């Protein structure tokens, strides 16, 4: 049901360990598919990337890669990751590879309301790995300037 999607939770009411356990139960141990049939795999080590953020970035230092603070904002959207992946109305974009400074179809970025973003890495036919999820306050314009995702297999028919 659409009304059951995109509900916020009060993250401060739970411990980090609770969320880590829930991550394992709700994501790592489940078979999760995108709306278009891609199986997305989740791993324990994805938790930190998805739910920690950098204090340097909060202070406007955008070069920092360290993630040193658990984000209540990200945790409040804990279940949104599944919602985004399953949402056929999400805006889809080709992902950006910072190392090569180019767009790559091995990454897919899904954007939904309030600029919430989920990134997956496609590594085989109908298989992907979860990369991260966040509210794209500072990067949403850059994401939306990139190429739209087009399902090349669907268009090849």
Q: Regions from the language model: what does each represent?
A:
Residues 1-157:
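Ribonuclease/tRNase effector modules and their secretory precursors
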